[in-house]
């Protein structure tokens, strides 16, 4: 299943000679939080009404003129909508979260684009101002199953990117008087009001438990009147996903990206996952040359990604891996930065976790891998395709000598290792003979990648 790494946090892979490292607690370095919202399109009556009601447009941190309610002092209305204003006029689909180590905004954005391409707009029934617990919100009568399905797809699909809540964050949530089921949801999804507890709503006030009944009545009637024009003008439809950003604790959540839904299927769904193409073969077989040829001849294919390796060796000519020293490599590994880790030829190799987001977004990932790692790969990623590249022993020696990277005992060691692994007979292992010209081998590899789609 995509998302598993085949590497236990805090230990080296099985078969390594070194002692295990201690388990390291992982936390997000960034203070930025992201939330997945529905927000009405900018110039719609709904967006205009929501912005003037709360006193802030979702796309800007700056306040705007707030609506005037006769009988309610402006300072009182401002204080009773302060938290709602900070979060902006929206409906939550996935509650705020920090990005987990190894993921960045580009991963979030590419997953969001893939997600939205598989979603269809949902027209909401009977949008009304109603009390929800101790605050006021716009709520709807339906279609509840479709809305709940969309929210749950958001919660599950993007959870790969979510950093776990810290102990203080968990404790703060638990103080809200959660029941056992809500506590379990908090632990699982980072938010207690998911699954059967999810209620689609667009918050209009903060908690009103300490406000006078007359004040609450006046604000509710004003809200009903304020949104009546939008209700009459155009139906409200969940037609896009908004990514909102909180730059630092307490800052306003500001709209960063709004991505329209564009699903063409009969029903909304999750994006189809991409596949891993794990290219292996002995030293000198020409993997790097083949992969470079394919990369050049597939330029512009946004659905094909060539994973960068992290290696404990300095980069040389025509190489593009991330070079780190051994201590840094194992710190990254213990911190959960890698989806794959292996060792070969006295070097450490890692593939960063960003490939998991690529796969979720439906992109195929090509990896320059290791034959020894194939069993672990297929355990962690059962759908992976292994491309086993081979050539004659004499040709391997010629190519190793020509590249002049290893000499003497190091060269002999690589030649000896070339004989230590035999291709697996599993169905997802594809043999590729690279004994001929580069163009011929490269075209074979490119055909494999294209035919597998």
Curated annotation (Swiss-Prot):
<dbReference type="InterPro" id="IPR008145">
    <property type="entry name" value="GK/Ca_channel_bsu"/>
</dbReference>
<feature type="region of interest" description="Disordered">
    <location>
        <begin position="1"/>
        <end position="21"/>
    </location>
</feature>
<comment type="function">
    <text>Catalyzes the phosphorylation of ribose 1,5-bisphosphate to 5-phospho-D-ribosyl alpha-1-diphosphate (PRPP).</text>
</comment>
<keyword id="KW-0547">Nucleotide-binding</keyword>
<feature type="region of interest" description="unknown">
    <location>
        <begin position="1"/>
        <end position="271"/>
    </location>
</feature>
<dbReference type="InterPro" id="IPR009389">
    <property type="entry name" value="DUF1045"/>
</dbReference>
<protein>
    <recommendedName>
        <fullName>Ribose 1,5-bisphosphate phosphokinase PhnN</fullName>
        <ecNumber>2.7.4.23</ecNumber>
    </recommendedName>
</protein>
<dbReference type="InterPro" id="IPR027417">
    <property type="entry name" value="P-loop_NTPase"/>
</dbReference>
<comment type="pathway">
    <text>Metabolic intermediate biosynthesis; 5-phospho-alpha-D-ribose 1-diphosphate biosynthesis; 5-phospho-alpha-D-ribose 1-diphosphate from D-ribose 5-phosphate (route II): step 3/3.</text>
</comment>
<dbReference type="InterPro" id="IPR012699">
    <property type="entry name" value="PhnN"/>
</dbReference>
<keyword id="KW-0067">ATP-binding</keyword>
<dbReference type="GO" id="GO:0033863">
    <property type="term" value="F:ribose 1,5-bisphosphate phosphokinase activity"/>
</dbReference>
<dbReference type="GO" id="GO:0019634">
    <property type="term" value="P:organic phosphonate metabolic process"/>
</dbReference>
<dbReference type="GO" id="GO:0005524">
    <property type="term" value="F:ATP binding"/>
</dbReference>
<dbReference type="Pfam" id="PF06299">
    <property type="entry name" value="DUF1045"/>
</dbReference>
<dbReference type="GO" id="GO:0006015">
    <property type="term" value="P:5-phosphoribose 1-diphosphate biosynthetic process"/>
</dbReference>
<keyword id="KW-0808">Transferase</keyword>
<comment type="similarity">
    <text>In the C-terminal section; belongs to the ribose 1,5-bisphosphokinase family.</text>
</comment>
<feature type="region of interest" description="Ribose 1,5-bisphosphokinase">
    <location>
        <begin position="272"/>
        <end position="453"/>
    </location>
</feature>
């Amino acid at each position: 299943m995509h998302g598993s790494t085949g590497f236990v946090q805090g230990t080296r892979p099985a078969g390594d000679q070194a002692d295990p490292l201690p388990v390291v607690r992982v936390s997000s370095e960034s203070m930025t939080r992201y939330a997945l919202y529905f927000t009405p399109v900018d110039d719609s009556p709904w967006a205009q009404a929501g912005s003037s009601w709360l006193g802030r447009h979702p796309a800007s941190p700056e306040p705007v003129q707030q609506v005037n309610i006769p009988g309610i002092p402006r300072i009182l209305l401002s204080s009773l909508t302060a938290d709602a204003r900070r979060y902006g006029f929206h409906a939550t689909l996935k509650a705020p979260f920090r990005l987990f180590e190894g993921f960045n905004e580009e991963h979030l954005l590419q997953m969001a684009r893939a997600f939205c391409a598989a979603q269809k707009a949902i027209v909401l029934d009977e949008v009304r101002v109603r009390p929800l617990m101790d605050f006021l919100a716009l709520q709807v009568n339906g279609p509840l199953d479709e809305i709940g399905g969309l929210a749950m797809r958001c919660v599950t699909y993007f959870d790969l990117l979510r950093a776990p809540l810290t102990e203080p964050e968990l404790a703060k949530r638990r103080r809200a008087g959660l029941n056992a089921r809500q506590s379990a949801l908090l632990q699982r999804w980072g938010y207690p009001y998911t699954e059967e507890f999810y209620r689609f709503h667009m918050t209009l006030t903060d908690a009103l438990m300490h406000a006078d009944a007359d004040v609450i009545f006046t604000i509710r009637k004003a809200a009903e009147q304020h949104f009546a024009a939008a209700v009459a003008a155009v139906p409200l439809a969940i037609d896009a996903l908004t990514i909102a950003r909180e730059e630092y604790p307490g800052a306003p959540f500001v709209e960063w990206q709004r991505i329209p839904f564009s699903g063409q299927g009969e029903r909304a769904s999750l994006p189809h996952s991409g596949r891993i193409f794990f290219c292996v073969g002995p030293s000198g077989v020409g993997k790097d040359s083949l992969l470079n040829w394919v990369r050049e001849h597939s330029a512009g294919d946004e659905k094909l990604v060539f994973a960068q390796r992290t290696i404990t060796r300095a980069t040389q000519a025509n190489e593009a891996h991330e070079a780190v020293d051994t201590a840094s490599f194992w710190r990254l590994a213990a911190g959960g930065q890698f989806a794959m880790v292996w060792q070969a030829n006295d070097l450490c190799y890692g593939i960063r976790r960003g490939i998991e987001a690529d796969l979720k977004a439906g992109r195929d990932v090509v990896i320059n891998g290791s034959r020894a790692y194939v069993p672990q790969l297929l355990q962690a990623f059962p759908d992976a395709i292994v491309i086993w590249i081979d050539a004659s022993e004499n040709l391997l020696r010629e190519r190793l000598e020509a590249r002049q990277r290893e000499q003497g005992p190091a060269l002999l060691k690589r030649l000896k290792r070339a004989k230590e692994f035999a291709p697996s007979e599993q169905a997802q292992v594809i043999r590729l003979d690279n004994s001929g010209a580069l163009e011929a081998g490269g075209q074979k590899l490119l055909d494999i990648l294209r035919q597998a789609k």
